[in-house]
Each structure stands twice: as C-alpha cells, then as structure tokens.
Amino acid sequence: EKPERSNKSKPAPQTLLDILKEEKRSHVHGGIYHKIQIELTYNSNHIEGSQLTHDQTRYIFETDTIGISEEGIRVDDIIETATHFRCIDEIIENAKAPLSEKLIKHLHFILKTGTSDAKKDWFVVGDYKKLPNEVGGMETTLPENVSSEIKKLLTAYNSKENITFSVSATTRAPR
C-alpha cells in the first residue's frame, strides 16, 4: 500500500470569518469578502455624505485608482473609501477579540488619517469628538457623554453570547 499523502488539499473554510480571511488572502474577486468591502464601504461613506458612486467605490477597491470623470470628486471621499477598506480588514482580523474602545479608536485613526478633518484644530484622529455635531440632521451624543455611552454599548454588546453577522444585498444607501 502507498502511504497517505501529506499534501492533501485543505478542507473548505467552514465559518464566514474563515471564508473572509481566505478570500482576503487569495484576493478573490466576486466573493463575499469582495462584496462586503464594496457594499459596506459604499453605504457607510454615503451616510457620511460621500458623493462617490457605487461603481467608483468598487473601482477604488479593485484598482486603488479612480477614473477621470466630468464631475469633481472630493479627495476625502477617495481617502475615506480607501481607508474604509483597511478598517474592514482590521475588523476581520480582530473578529475573535472582544470589541473594545481601543479597537474603535484605532479604526477611527485608520479611517481619518490623511483627511481634511485631520487638519482641523478641534478634530482628534483616533479619539472621541470634542465638539457637538449632528449627522444627517439628527443630533448625536454630546462629547462629554461619548465615552460613558460607548462603555455601556460595549458592555451590552460583549455580554451577548451569540453575535451574528448578516449581509443583505437588497439594503443599501441610495445611489
């Protein structure tokens, strides 16, 4: 009898996280990792007012460039789209760790480094806001309450036993 081969192919990844990590490593186009990067980045950036189209977001992810168009595109839109891809990678790589203020601030640091916000005296990259603001016409938590509210949120989130992640291909920001 022949000995069993030691280089048998590995079994297919079993969890969503395994699939995401494998597709990220393999640079798979059209898989769930590819879709998540584009859809989450496009929708998140549009909530914040980005004017990039879905196709432009996809193009930045796939090529690290943006085609020349007739419309002016804000540099911050391009920077935040590219850094958003890095944030999703960080989340995937840290998915097994408890969610923490340190990770949230690290993601903010990645996202905002190099943007025009980073040049503002009152804006702190990688930390909580210092001034009150609103998003989409809605009031947000006051700066002095952000840390305690985040702690409450993290305590509630990290106490959950079965945290699931679902992706809806039908829900997205208007294009």
Predicted region positions:
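FIC/Doc superfamily catalytic core
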Residues: 1-175
